[in-house]
Amino acid sequence: MRLFGKYLWILFKAQMQYRASFWLLSFGQFFIPFSVFAGLYFLFERFGQIRGWEFFEVALVFGVIHMAFAIAECLARGFDMFSGLVVSGEFDRLLVRPRSTVLQVLGSKFEFTRIGRLLQSLIVLVWAVAQVEAHWTLMKAATLLFMIVSGTMIFAGIFILMAAMCFWTVQGLEVSSIFTDGGREMAQYPLNIYQKWVTRFFTYVIPFGCVNYLPLQYILDRSEGPGFLYMLMPLAGCLFLVPCLLFWQFGVRRYRSTGS
């Protein structure tokens, strides 16, 4: 962690060399998601509810998912841009260093400008928490925190999976956007509004359902069974990260340099 902190400090100083650009990008990241949230607001303004879900209930999920995505984009941006390291041959240099390749790729890129998106998501989340009809307890507050952490782990895991594919494809695949940007757009709504096969895929394969739908049921007092099970449900995101890292190690062992 100490080494990772040094990576962050170096990257922060590098980005602050162009302060005007940094702040403009941060402001852009703050305002761009407002168009998405405005669409959500007008949707509920027109129809009132969707499959029994009220506006502030969905806004709570919106805030959680977009905050998780913003944090994952900040931390795992190196994996999102990993194909450049493979194409240029820079990954060869990482392999000869006595440090984890995961740590080095994490430290190769960090998007501090995503703090704008993070702040916007936090504002929406605080507003939704204040307005949603829920009896808040310490366990429910912890569940909300676990939802954010788990969502971050899931998005980071997807970035790692897509980066690992570059060991075979060299160039990054645009199909990854289906699971990153597409996953963010899909998971900002409770999963039960979709077809059953979609719900099952995003519960048992990529466990977004364990981040938004199931714990949200507990927070809104609509769950059945012990509350602590729903509280721990978001931790499935941490488990999702394990096979992603194993696949990364599998790819590293089969890496062949491009010769650049």
Model-identified regions with their sequence ranges:
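Hydrophobic transmembrane alpha-helices and immediately adjacent juxtamembrane helices
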Residues: 1-260
